[in-house]
Amino acid sequence: MSAIPSSNKRRTIPELRARKGKSPIVALTAYSALTARFVDPYADFILVGDSLAMVEHGMATTIGASLDMMILHGQSVMRGSEKAAVVIDMPFGSYEASPQEAYHNAVRILSETGCSAVKLEGGSHLAPVIAFLTARGVPVMGHIGLTPQYVQTLGGFKIQGHSSEQQDKIKQDALDFEAAGAFSVVLEGVTEPLAREITDNIAIPTIGIGASSYCDGQVLVLEDMLGFNDKVPRFVKKFAHLGDDIKKAVSDYATAVSNRSFPAEDNIYRPKS
């Protein structure tokens, strides 16, 4: 299957990496062409996150996202965007077995979507995989701290970095990802001082989600910041309350259909005289 044509106006990976310590990088998730069109004019990169398993498919965790699912949604986002770089999550089980398998699956994502890069979750044990991919031309964004694909191991969606052991591990994860060739690293659900220290001590941009305003950029799940859901993590700020607007619109529609005020004269076709 051929890739979706990619705009030559898109942000590039070298451009994103060069933003280290400069103006903050703006990122949001998108899972469809429709949402990508709204995000694209304002984002430096769009993340097609495996969070789509929960947001779009109603799953309890991100673990159920499949490679084909990520590719399908990635293709849709590529069709709906022109300016932003597009980074696609490699789903759970698609890169852990061996560097060779990770490369095969990463190439599928890149070639079938035309996206800019892939993202991997984990820790220092994945450094050889990242090195293998980057040595073969696959741009990689890392993801450390609270890693949703490891939710079973972590015992839930728990903030990381409270203990000295966690802090030392996450700092080493960041250093090892940088050394392996990752162009950026997402810091999710970590204590603010830890995020600040990591940002100061690596030469690649840090992208925070529940981390620190001191990070080199921020990313949020679009549906969370738009207020689709009543309950969101503490680190989310709702910039709108579209969930309430949608409920009202659907309720008004149902009422209009029930009392036959819709369709009205403006919504129907009369025979031409």
Swiss-Prot record:
Compartment(s): Cytoplasm
Catalysed reaction equations from the record: 3-methyl-2-oxobutanoate + (6R)-5,10-methylene-5,6,7,8-tetrahydrofolate + H2O = 2-dehydropantoate + (6S)-5,6,7,8-tetrahydrofolate
Cofactor note: Binds 1 Mg(2+) ion per subunit.
PANTHER family membership: 3-METHYL-2-OXOBUTANOATE HYDROXYMETHYLTRANSFERASE
Predominant location category: cytoplasm
E.C. designation(s): 2.1.2.11
Stated name of the protein: 3-methyl-2-oxobutanoate hydroxymethyltransferase 2
Binding-site list for Mg(2+): D50, D89, E121
Gene3D superfamilies: Phosphoenolpyruvate-binding domains
Species the sequence originates in: Zymomonas mobilis subsp. mobilis (strain ATCC 31821 / ZM4 / CP4)
Keywords of the record: Cytoplasm, Magnesium, Metal-binding, Pantothenate biosynthesis, Transferase
A GO MF term: 3-methyl-2-oxobutanoate hydroxymethyltransferase activity
Residues annotated as binding 3-methyl-2-oxobutanoate: D50, S51, D89, K119
Swiss-Prot/TrEMBL GO biological process terms: pantothenate biosynthetic process
Domain of life of the native organism: Bacteria
Function: Catalyzes the reversible reaction in which hydroxymethyl group from 5,10-methylenetetrahydrofolate is transferred onto alpha-ketoisovalerate to form ketopantoate.
